[in-house]
């Protein structure tokens, strides 16, 4: 008892020797009983509250899960394992393996966009290890990574648009697929935004006729091995690698393109592409090359001197925005059937030299934007251009900041209706020969000589602009002094009002 008392002293420093009172046994027992009672009341109450909270939360989330899961298709997406389809003959099972990276479970998995009713050829669709007879698009219930196997009950002849718009597909494996009868691969992966890799194995493409838009819009595709492709019967490659924005290197040296008739937009928008091997290309039957390399802005050079272009009719925007290419060797190109050079070299900001003096332009109708913003182009020999069929030359040399002279005396402009901005912002242009221009049909000439800062002499004596109404921006920003040779009888009032002050007018 004494030790207990000493403890009380330690715990209660306010007590001293003069106020020490011997503890009452009765009071001590009462105190112990009270403490025991309080503890016995508090502990169960706290435990009960915790248990009740957990139980309530469990009921709540279970209810939410039940309501959500009832909205999903009746397929098993929770078991995330590959099924085993091992076989000594890889193609005997005739299936395609897929991997999906599902970030938004509300987006449907587009597997059946084909117009040739591919879903009727599907034997089973295995999702997460369980075979499901699914004949319509479905959604993954939860975000995550999934493995899917599509097994076919017979040989297909077409894969057209099979995965088109399948934005959550990341990897496709055709190693076990029987491709012997395939003739159509157009749009196969078009719009597969998350596709990064495709394993084709020994995919048989011998009978394939079209690969149009095959990888178009695969903006995350970063590697492709097509070394086993037999393209000897392919006729359509237009848009094949368009918008492959992460593709750095592409080796097509094995491609046989002797039967290809369309290559338009083939590499368009593949702005990360740095290495492109087309050494085996035979383009002797190609008719359309428009936008073929459009916005391949990372390509440092293009080895296309061997291209045969005698059947090509359209070269619109073929090199548009090839910003790093400094020179093009087109000396062997036959352009006799081409009708459009529109935007052909526009945006080639580093282009300094291009040999096109031999071009046959006798059938060309469109030359608008042809050299637009060729900022480093210093020389251009186009004296031999035949332009009698051309209807538009709008912005043809606009932004050619380093070009110092242009001899267009041989140009026949009798059918041109639009010359707007034709020489605009050619800041360094000192010599411009347009003395033989015929402009009777021209309807637009606005901005034609804007910002020709170095130009001191201009012969527009043959200009007939009576039908052209230009209220402003004909000579805006031109050199403050110079000479203009003009025929006042053929010049509209709108142009007369804009003749630059400080210039000497010489009537012819």
Set out the residue ranges of the language-model regions.
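N-terminal capping/linker segments that flank leucine-rich repeat
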Residues: 5-26, 33-181, 187, 201, ...
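Register-specific detector for alpha-helical tandem repeat solenoids, activating on a conserved position
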Residues: 160-161, 186-187, 212-213, 238-239, ...
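Small/polar residue-rich beta-strand/coil "junction" motifs that cap repeat-based extracellular fibers
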Residues: 448, 472-477, 483
């Amino acid at each position: 008892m004494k030790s207990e008392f000493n403890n009380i002293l330690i715990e209660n420093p306010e007590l001293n020797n003069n106020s020490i009172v011997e503890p009452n046994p009765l009071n001590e027992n009462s105190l112990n009983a009270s403490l025991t009672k309080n503890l016995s009341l508090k502990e169960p109450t706290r435990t009960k509250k915790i248990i009740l909270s957990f139980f309530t939360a469990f009921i709540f989330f279970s209810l939410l899960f039940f309501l959500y899961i009832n909205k999903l298709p009746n397929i098993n997406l929770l078991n995330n394992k590959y099924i085993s389809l091992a076989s000594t003959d890889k193609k005997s099972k005739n299936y395609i393996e897929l991997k999906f990276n599902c970030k938004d479970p509300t987006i449907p998995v587009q597997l059946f966009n084909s117009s040739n009713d591919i879903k009727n050829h599907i034997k089973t669709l295995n999702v997460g290890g369980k075979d499901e007879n699914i004949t319509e698009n479905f959604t993954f219930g939860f975000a995550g990574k999934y493995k899917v196997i599509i097994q076919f009950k017979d040989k297909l002849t077409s894969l057209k648009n099979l995965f088109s718009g399948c934005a959550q597909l990341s990897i496709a494996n055709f190693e076990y697929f029987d491709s012997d009868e395939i003739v159509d691969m157009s749009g196969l992966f078009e719009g597969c935004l998350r596709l990064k890799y495709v394993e084709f194995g020994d995919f048989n493409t011998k009978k394939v006729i079209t690969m149009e838009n095959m990888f178009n819009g695969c903006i995350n595709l970063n590697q492709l091995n097509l070394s086993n492709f037999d393209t000897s019967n392919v006729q359509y490659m237009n848009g094949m690698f368009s918008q492959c924005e992460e593709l750095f290197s592409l080796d097509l040296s094995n491609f046989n393109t002797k039967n290809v008739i369309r290559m338009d937009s083939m590499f368009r928008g593949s702005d990360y592409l740095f290495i492109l091997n087309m050494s085996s290309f035979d383009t002797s039957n190609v008719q359309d090359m428009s936008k073929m390399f459009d916005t391949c802005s990372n390509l440092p050079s293009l080895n296309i001197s061997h291209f045969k272009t005698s059947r090509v009719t359209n070269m619109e925007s073929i090199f548009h925005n090839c910003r790093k290419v400094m020179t093009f060797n087109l000396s062997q190109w036959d352009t006799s059937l081409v009708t459009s050079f529109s935007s052909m070299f526009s945006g080639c900001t580093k282009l300094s030299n291009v040999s096109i003096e031999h071009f046959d332009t006798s059938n060309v109708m469109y030359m608008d934007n042809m050299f637009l913003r060729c900022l480093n182009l210093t020389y251009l020999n186009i004296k031999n251009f035949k332009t009698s069929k051309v209807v538009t030359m709008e912005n043809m040399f606009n932004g050619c900041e380093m070009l110092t002279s242009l001899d267009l005396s041989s140009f026949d402009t009798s059918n041109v209706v639009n010359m707007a901005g034709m020489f605009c912002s050619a800041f360094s242009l000192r010599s411009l020969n347009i003395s033989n221009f015929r402009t009777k049909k021209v309807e637009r000439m606005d901005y034609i000589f804007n910002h020709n800062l170095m130009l001191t002499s201009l012969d527009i004596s043959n200009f007939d602009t009576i039908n052209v109404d230009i209220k402003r921006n004909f000579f805006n920003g031109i050199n403050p002094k110079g000479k203009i040779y003009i025929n006042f009888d053929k010049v509209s009032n709108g142009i007369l009002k804009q003749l630059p002050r400080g210039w000497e007018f010489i009537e012819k």
